[in-house]
Amino acid sequence: MQTTANIPTHKNKAVELWHKFIEARPYLVFFVGLFFVIYHFFGVADALLGIIFLFFSRTIIEEPGLSFMNYARRLGWFIVMALCATLAGLQEFLFVGVTFFYLFLITLTQSDDYLPRNFYWLGMGYLLLLIYPVSIPEIPTRLLATLLSIACTTLFIYSMRAILTKTGKLNVFARDREYVRKAFEDISKQLVVLAELGAVSVAEVQKTEGFTEVADARFTHIADADCVADLPDPSVLQRKIRPKQTYRIAQEYAQLEYGTVFRQRGLLSGRQCYTFALLLCCEQLADMIHATSKDPHAITPEDQQYFTDLADIFADYATGRITKVSQMAATLETFIESHSFADTCHRESWNGVLEALLRTLRDTRLSRDESTPFIKSVKYRIMFLRDNANLQNTQTRFALQLATIVSLAALVDVLLTRLVDMPYGIWIPIVAFTILNTYNDETLKSTANNAIGTLVGIALFALFVHFIPSSFLMPVVITVGYLIIVMNIAPIASITAGTQMALTALYSADAALSTTLFARLALVIIAAMCVVMVIFVFMQTQRSATLRTKISELERIDRRLITQIHFGLKHGQVNLWRTVQLLYYMHMSSGFMEDLAEHLDTKEAKWESRPGRSKSVEQIKRLKHDVDRVLALNYKFAMDAEHAVMLLDPRRLHDDSLSDPHPETWVTPDSTARIKHIDATNERLEEKLHKLETMQHIEKDD
């Protein structure tokens, strides 16, 4: 019985592996071509570039939104990598110094808390090229090999993008529309629940007074209820309204796009701004639905009709009955003109957000814009580094730790080479670099995986050498090894395959097999010792410290956001691009903090059963409580900030106002009621910002 039950699981795994193999075939074919072409013309010293560029191509193909200019800027770093590796290989102790500065700067500038391992292939490429150092006369050859790799990789990437886009497997615009559809569907469902909640409240009054009318035919079951006791429970309906569910859709989109955003030096492209702005509008609608649901007795039959009609519009787009954005915009415009609230505050709130949504829907030019301004992106990245390049920041501490440990491993390599003439000691810093992760527990787990994968890899390599002729050893091992790595079966499998490729580079037909295998094992052990000896004493990175820096980052974003809103109150409009950018990073920071808090839950459950950890468990509970408070306060602040931004949308201004050289004379179409509503929103923002600023920081661990 047990064996039979396991058959579907094994079958599913086999199917999954087959799909991974199918997806990996183009990469494998290109890798074999690139690696062996460079190997044939330039030798094994530069053929290692093929490995790096193939992994790079896999990442970039899966991020189709990156513009060519940003892609070219990214490729420029590979030229820097090749030059630094060449410079470091000219002299032994120069190698140690260059390694420290290169890895520190690459880690600091090419990764952050959201993409902590983004520097990996630039660092690994640098170290792999040091396996075979070149002399000064050979530098042009290496640069030529690098440029050839760049040209071939670019051709491959854009060919794959074209094929995947044509087959529908990869379409960034379709992916964006799917997120918008998901958010619209969520809003539609919540509007229906809100209308039903209003119908229940009206029915309660009407049952008491002897009336049974409802505003919408969909709620006749409420009118047909025999008595008030048979009506749906309002509290149950209120629980169905979940505004944070819409917020999480925007968070999910923000996290999905962050790889591309980072490679754009941290700026959103027009397409990303367009989609994220639509999701922000949905967030605002969800927040207003939630606010309205708190007082269901104030929902009139006319309000119910408003909500049901609006729900139909969003449902039509979500289900595909409305397929064009222009059609959605026209339908929404008709709705705004024909529907309204009697209550002034409700009218200004809902109309302000729906008008912002309408203006965004019509800005279709922005939805196709994949570019980011070069100068602005450089300025933004400098500002980001100025804010975060300090010893309190987790990634800065990790950059120092990584650079120090790998440089120490490089020094051990130099000393062993000089003292005992150990060949290929470069694998010590390579292994140290491979197993290091941001947090110590991740590093220890990676060390264990490396140890197991290395032992298995050594055993398999001994078999390969025994059965495969030496002339076929490199083509077979390199090809199969790369296939296993690119299929991403499991960490240990990837390390085993990597060991095969490493041993192939180390192994010489003239050397004894036992000597090669022993050298590989010894190098891994030495590298692991270098890492373990340092990670617990130098620049430790803890999740509690990361949470503290994220609190500070959220406060900084909030202050900058309210500065933009104050500017908007003074001049009648905000800088829409800047505010959307700030709201994007607010979503990223809060999502990152939620992920760290989930890890704290796991840690707490693990330590609660240990009597000696009671103090640590208490610290974790206090930390979680503080994080929850910060996230709750920041969510409320974000909702009011978004509302103010939409009310101060610069697109509300008349075209003639936009060309006026004196901004203080601009005339906006705002009514007195809307101005009062904006002032009230600003007061709420100031109050919530004060709560965030006066809240005590997270307590430090004892």
Language-model features: locations:
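C-terminal functional regions that serve as terminal interaction/effector modules
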Residues: 471, 484-485, 491-512, 671, ...
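A compact, surface-exposed functional segment
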Residues: 175-176, 182, 472-493, 552-561
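Cytosolic regulatory and coupling regions of membrane transport/channel systems
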Residues: 1-29, 141-411, 415, 419-422, ...
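Pore- and pathway-forming membrane helices of multi-pass small-molecule/ion transporters and channels
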Residues: 2-13, 22-65, 72-79, 96-142, ...
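Membrane-interfacial segments
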Residues: 42, 88, 92, 113, ...
